[in-house]
Amino acid sequence: MGNHLTEMAPTASSFLPHFQALHVVVIGLDSAGKTSLLYRLKFKEFVQSVPTKGFNTEKIRVPLGGSRGITFQVWDVGGQEKLRPLWRSYTRRTDGLVFVVDAAEAERLEEAKVELHRISRASDNQGVPVLVLANKQDQPGALSAAEVEKRLAVRELAAATLTHVQGCSAVDGLGLQQGLERLYEMILKRKKAARGGKKRR
């Protein structure tokens, strides 16, 4: 499994006539459920996966309310500690970051917080929209999206960084549609702002 893509449909697709695909990178600690989320999006079913040693990539088309779909090139990068220094190689020039956390494993949220802040503050990622997926909401004791947002100190990310925290589950697909809609909206907003800034110069 790997080297594919899934597409999404836009709410304002007419604004993006020139994009073949939006580049999105999925990162997070090991065992957070990144690959399972990727394949839930692609195959619309839960796929039990093994730890990612490098990366997976899929083209994903997801209806976001518009009549025309938008293709997302989604890169899922391994989260083991030894692989984390490689994240920046994948996030360079990305349109959006998806940071996945295991909401049922509260003891690792501090570690996740450190990695989230490190990657979002990297020079190449300044201002890139961040969608945090609080995965495994199907498990007993999973923290809510609001609690995950608080523990990760998401609001302390750079003021120019658009963020959204969404509870979700790779098992039943809960919350994924809403999360992707918000990510798409944030990407659109950033591109519009960038275009407006160029016109004013």
Curated annotation (Swiss-Prot):
**Per UniProt, where does GTP bind?**
28-35, 76-80, 135-138
SMART domains xref list: ARF, RAB, RAS, SAR
Record GO terms (molecular function)? GTP binding; GTPase activity
A Gene Ontology biological process noted in the UniProt record is: intracellular protein transport
Q: Where in the cell is it found?
A: Nucleus, Nucleolus; Cell membrane; Nucleus; Cytoplasm
Task: Name the InterPro entries on file.
Answer: P-loop_NTPase, Small_GTP-bd, Small_GTPase_ARF, Small_GTPase_ARF/SAR
Per UniProt, subunit arrangement is: Interacts with CYTH2; the interaction is direct and ARL4D GTP-dependent. Does not interact with ARL4D.
Q: What is this protein called?
A: ADP-ribosylation factor-like protein 4D
What organism does this protein naturally occur in? Homo sapiens
